[in-house]
Amino acid sequence: MMLKMKKKETQIMKKYLVTGCAGFIGSNFVYYMLKKYDDILLVNLDKLTYAGNLENLKGVEGDPRHVFVQGDICDKELVASLFEKYDFDYVINFAAESHVDRSIANPEIFVQTNVMGTVNLLQRAKEAWYDAATKTWKEGKKYLQVSTDEVYGALGA
């Protein structure tokens, strides 16, 4: 009688650049992903502004699947170096200036982060994921833009 050995399937680790994860929504996403998946790496890029708090990530401290990088999504060199080092499969952007009262007082910061920072992430992803010579995109790469803001004024009738 011959026994057939089943080959052990190896999972390919998926690598995520996740921005703004010291905030409420981003930190909950980190906890969710690390609880649900064993074979992932989350590289968390966060500037740690008024909206971010490292205390939100206390529970994942020391988890080898989570790497925290303090930095700005507007920093072209930093973002490019992270793409080069980790060869991300996914980018999920939670980073944003999101308080309406602050946007009125200082709109330039909002435009810089919410518009130019997002453009920077998209450009670095394009550089990493698009082969201009063959005019093809690397398979399976994804970018997700998450956007929230406060609601103000009267709603509905």
PLM regions and their residue ranges:
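N-terminal Rossmann-like NAD(P)+-binding domain of SDR-like oxidoreductases, especially those catalyzing
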Residues: 4-157
